[in-house]
């Protein structure tokens, strides 16, 4: 498994395969999945974290069932751009996953994704209890949608480059 940049992922992704977004928390892993055209992110179930081995197995089973081509995992960078303990934990999780799968990972700056997800859920008048259940997958969708938009931008740039004289 490799940790790729978004540009490297854009070059390597096979067509018509889904990409998964992950919001790694201490108690849960929020998951979202793209459509086959990689335009839209849809929230999915949450994996309740137990220990790394069980978490990895649940994630890999999900990836196999959904035919996931890559994972976009939120990197919880501090507002000032520095990396704290949560970033270190995310990087360690990705490193450990690398021993279990060949599916590539992309680290995606997730600043304010949970805040944005919570605002949307509040605007949808979702109760506090239901918000708590859905927030991680909603945040994973924000992470994935940002990455999908970047992939689309890279694809437009690549097709524009081919037309240049």
From Swiss-Prot:
SUPFAM superfamilies registered for this protein in UniProt: Ribonuclease H-like
UniProt lineage: Bacteria, Pseudomonadati, Pseudomonadota, Alphaproteobacteria, Hyphomicrobiales
Keyword list, A-Z: Cytoplasm, Hydrolase, Nuclease, Ribosome biogenesis
Pfam family, one: RuvX
Name used for this protein in its record: Putative pre-16S rRNA nuclease
Keyword hit for Hydrolase: yes
GO biological process: rRNA 5'-end processing
E.C. numbers: 3.1.-.-
Keyword Cytoplasm in annotation: yes
Enzyme class: hydrolase
Subcellular location: Cytoplasm
Organism this protein belongs to: Rhizobium meliloti (strain 1021) (Ensifer meliloti)
Family, per entry: Belongs to the YqgF nuclease family.
NCBIfam families named among the record's database cross-references: RNAse_H_YqgF
Gene Ontology molecular function: any one: nuclease activity
Function description: Could be a nuclease involved in processing of the 5'-end of pre-16S rRNA.
GO cellular component labels: cytosol
UniProt cross-references to InterPro entries, sorted A to Z: RNaseH-like_sf, YqgF, YqgF/RNaseH-like_dom, YqgF/RNaseH-like_dom_sf
CDD domains in the record: YqgF
């Amino acid at each position: 498994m490799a940790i790729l940049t978004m540009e490297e992922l854009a070059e390597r992704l096979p067509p018509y395969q889904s990409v998964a977004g992950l919001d790694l928390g201490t108690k849960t892993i929020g998951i979202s999945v793209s459509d086959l055209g990689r335009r839209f992110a849809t929230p999915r179930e949450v994996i309740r974290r137990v220990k790394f081995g069980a978490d990895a197995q649940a994630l890999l089973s999900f990836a196999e069932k959904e035919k996931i081509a890559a994972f976009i995992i939120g990197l919880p960078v501090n507002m000032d751009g520095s990396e704290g303990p949560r970033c270190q934990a995310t990087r360690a999780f990705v490193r450990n996953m690398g021993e279990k799968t060949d599916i590539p990972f992309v680290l995606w700056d997730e600043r304010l994704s949970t805040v944005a997800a919570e605002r949307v859920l509040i605007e949808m008048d979702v109760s506090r209890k239901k918000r708590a259940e859905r927030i991680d997958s909603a945040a994973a969708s924000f992470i994935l949608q940002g990455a999908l938009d970047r992939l689309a931008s890279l694809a437009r740039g690549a097709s524009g480059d081919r037309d240049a004289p």
